[in-house]
């Protein structure tokens, strides 16, 4: 991120190109850290078969327009049945499994480094905001959008993109 900022300040790169580069770097971080976190989590709790984590990016990341000071607006979802149970040595129900996994993913993305947090992560755009669960099923998300979401929440969806999850689910969402 520092190198992109230097290029911008020195006028060696177009601001829109730097913004896209910040976004691409953040997406790689989301994908790599999420995959590593899932692998570690599955070692303890197994998998919930037929279910996967999906991460939506909203705001500047969703629109591929990050700046050096942007946070990551993320909504975490899971596919499959919420009542399913993981198959690990310490099994968890589907909803609990994905909420704990989501907490770890957010923690990995916001880990403290020598220069501060890797990324500031904002999850308040999830269904029901801070009053809602950190990670909800895709079906619950769709129902919330149809029945309860405010107009501004629908507007926020115009910049939303799937940045982590299976390609078929990304297309469906």
Q: Can you name each region flagged by the protein language model?
A:
Residues 1-173:
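A nucleotide- and high-energy phosphate-metabolite-utilizing enzyme signature
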């Amino acid at each position: 991120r520092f190198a992109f900022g230097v290029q911008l300040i020195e006028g060696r790169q177009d601001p829109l190109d730097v913004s896209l580069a910040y976004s691409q770097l953040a997406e790689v971080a989301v994908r790599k850290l999420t995959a590593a976190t899932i692998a570690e989590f599955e070692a303890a709790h197994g998998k919930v078969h037929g279910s996967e984590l999906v991460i939506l990016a909203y705001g500047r990341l969703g629109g591929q327009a990050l700046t050096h000071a942007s946070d990551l607006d993320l909504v975490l979802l899971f596919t499959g049945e919420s009542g399913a149970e993981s198959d690990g040595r310490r099994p968890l129900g589907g909803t609990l499994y994905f909420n704990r996994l989501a907490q770890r993913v957010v923690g990995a993305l916001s880990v403290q480094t020598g220069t501060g947090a890797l990324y500031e992560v904002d999850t308040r755009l999830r269904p029901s905001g801070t009053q809602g669960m950190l990670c909800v099923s895709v079906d619950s998300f769709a129902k919330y959008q149809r029945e309860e979401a405010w107009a501004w929440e629908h507007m926020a969806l115009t910049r939303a993109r799937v940045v982590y999850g299976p390609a078929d689910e990304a297309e469906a969402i």
